[in-house]
Regions:
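Short hinge/gating elements
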Residues: 9, 32-52, 90-103
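Core structural elements
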Residues: 73-93
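A generic structural signal for short, solvent-exposed coil/turn residues
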Residues: 2-4, 29, 74-76
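Flexible helix-coil linker/hinge segments at domain or subdomain boundaries
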Residues: 44, 48-75, 102-150
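Flexible hinge/switch segments at interdomain interfaces of large molecular machines
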Residues: 13, 17-44, 78-79, 83-85
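Single conserved hydrophobic/aromatic residue that forms the stacking wall/gate
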Residues: 1-7, 12
Length: 150
């Protein structure tokens, strides 16, 4: 199945109300390869947030994907055959930040995308490491709940 069809199929299935699903693009008419589906973890409800998510963050994710191809983490010869799904958390308060630095936001999401792909392609963390460390790892928000901070 061509990646464009895979991406389209991923976009139309199981839509969650308010949780936008879009293909990562370099610009309004240039889709990144491998086809990459972005799924927002936040209900998108205002134009500024949408523009930041579907502009700065979307472009950053697309560049992080290409960085993975450029350095060989993803085989260039398989770029048309693979699909990536990225679950995106962008704090809703970003739309109220008048001093938002789009370059910093772009760089953070580009690097995070690249690092996540690199880990995934290298099977990190390994199942052995996870099993060995399971009882030592506490989700930070669970810990905050235990500590009475949320």
């Amino acid at each position: 199945i061509p990646s464009s069809l895979v991406g389209s199929e991923m976009c139309i299935r199981d839509r969650a109300k308010g949780h936008s699903k879009v293909l990562a693009i370099m610009n309004t008419d240039i889709m990144v390869k491998p086809a990459t589906l972005m799924i927002s973890k936040v209900t998108v409800d205002n134009t500024r947030y949408t523009n930041i998510l579907m502009g700065t963050v979307q472009g950053a994710i697309a560049n992080g994907v290409l960085d993975s191809v450029r350095d060989g983490t993803i085989d260039k010869n398989k770029a048309n055959d693979l699909g990536i799904i990225v679950s995106v958390w962008l704090n809703p308060s970003v739309s109220k930040d008048d001093s938002l630095d789009h370059k910093i936001l772009f760089d953070i999401h580009r690097k995070a995308t690249y690092q996540a792909i690199k880990k995934a392609m290298n099977n990190e963390p390994s199942i052995d490491w996870l099993l060995e460390n399971q009882d030592n790892i506490v989700h930070k928000y669970y810990q905050m709940g235990l500590d009475g901070k949320i």
